[in-house]
């Protein structure tokens, strides 16, 4: 992928605007809650619930953009706007990307 895992400037801008301590809390909240969004992607895919799937993908996309996790945001955008159902491999890929993004965000937050 051409995009960086985390756009440093976006993350730094967020820290400058909201404060480093608050961003650290946001990152931890995201790390705790985002896996549930991936679980929602999986369950809505297996249940054929297209709207729930799109909503979970949209949330991942929005959070990704907020933190500068551009690859995560792009993968989520593709899931959100793409046809439904999607191949389960796409959900597996976003789950793996989420793990990478969370690790990188935690490292940046703790600077």
Residue ranges and their predicted role:
Residues 1-9, 24-26, 31-32, 37, ...:
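Amphipathic, coiled-coil-like alpha-helical segments
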Residues 11-24, 55:
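Short, charged, low-complexity loops and linkers
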Residues 18, 41, 45-52, 67-68, ...:
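Short helix-adjacent coil turns
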